């Protein structure tokens, strides 16, 4: 529909008409006494100038000036004729122009509504032809929204790829930062780059593990075996938290309306804790307890120990238990969290041109295994490939995972120590079989000189012999410090792994030193065992330590990529960031959000000050105070300060010359300080 441009207001210039340009009267000043405001402003400015004259001019000059009579009237008239008119006309014009802008905006919005207006005759005609179900643009609008959404997704994905390539070019290498961006870096549990065993010069293997906590998931994930009572209690708990948040918002609004100070983050947390008892309590046996206000104790007892599946022999569609379970199942609370995660990762892989040939979804175990190729034989796979494992772990599973991990580590320690003992026994026997060579290593040499050292050195000084001193260091790893509760609850096993790795290296070196170029059966057997332990230990060390995980979603990815090509690495980087953005809420540090100023900018030396003059207190100041005066000195006033300090040096004498670093204003040191100040 065509629109007509109507005049919004007359563009009139007049000194007295309200709403005119340049007028001293405004429509916005309907309830204000303009003359009283002007008189108050002029009176204040006149008194300021008179007070300034009274303080600056001598008394005889003030007596000659008629301050109380003619001068005040002249000042008053000057302000009244100039300052008042300029200031008042500017304010009036600004207010009127703002009204015109608002009025024009309202008119434009009204024209938009008129353009969409449909005459009554056309609406009746459409109803007679078909009806609203036929002439409905809802589906077309949904299609347009989907089209724009896909377009925006492709644009964003292209921008992410460009950003990833740019970062890799700037780095000139591939590192952990190429995968996960800064806002998601906290979710990384382990990321390791290592050369491929078959082609170490051209191919790299990457291990990446990401842990998304329960509290960070957009849609919570529950195990398939979770009871219906647990799901309902979780819903009730979320309802209580929402109610507490609304109550806190209401309290905030009341404080703002009353003009009081807003609550701090700590105060909000304490208030939330106080409100918990208003919604629930710990009395499980009382049917009238607050915890049973939303759902009665009788219903909770009916659904106790009710899980995802019901025994067909006891199933009845009309029972209360079955209907409550049906309501929960219709909302799909049990499965929607994990299903959303699977849909997200698979759709992102499809749109990112990262296809896959093998997928296995363990629905009841909440685990997804996805591989780019179905074959698992490394010798038949290309150098560009990936596989990922998506699994949800609760606290009970993590406890068992940690137990198994620790048992496996102790088993490795037992096997490595056993091979160490066998190799050491063989080494000692090989030394005993050498009749001609009495000295093979440092221990043999120490035995030869043992009596001589005891007789000539230790007995004279009274010190104990080396063999009588308790040997704490095993010469393999440094002494391990005592464990605290933190180490016992969070086993890293870094010390044990480093010690085993060190033992494997020492055993290989000792085998080479014992046999050189000889390969008897003993050497071959021990080298085979050593190679097996090394390969298995590397596989074990490549896994994620469950002591570092927390209950939530675990994304474990293994990538093999060509070093020069890096196609899979770049593609998986975009997939990971988009996946984390879709299912994780992330976290925001409230301390940093409320911290409005950096500490480095809050310093006493930010407010620069000039060097002080030569007063009596300045004479006895220390050298540190004089140095701070030199630092705070400005080059613009360097000459004037130096001129004033000439008299100070003449009065103080030699003592002031020694302590006053500021006094060297005209020398070379003063010029250097001026350069530093600039």
UniProtKB/Swiss-Prot annotation:
Q: Which UniProt key words apply to this protein?
A: Coiled coil, Cytoplasm
TM ranges: none
Tell me which species this is from.
Treponema pallidum (strain Nichols)
Q: Which residues form a coiled coil?
A: 24-49, 290-311, 397-417, 522-540
Descriptive protein name: Cytoplasmic filament protein A
Query: What biological function has been recorded for the protein in this entry?
Result: Component of the cytoplasmic filaments that run the length of the organism just underneath the cytoplasmic membrane.
GO cellular component terms listed in the entry, alphabetical order: cytoplasm
UniProt superkingdom: Bacteria
Where does it mainly reside? cytoplasm
Alphabetized InterPro entries for the sequence: Cyto_Filament_Comp
Where does this one sit in the cell?
A: Cytoplasm
Asked whether the keyword Cytoplasm is assigned, the reply is yes
Gene that codes for this?
A: cfpA
Q: Where is this region: Disordered?
A: 1-24, 656-678
Q: Where is the composition biased (Basic residues)?
A: 667-678
Q: Show the taxonomic lineage.
A: Bacteria, Pseudomonadati, Spirochaetota, Spirochaetia, Spirochaetales
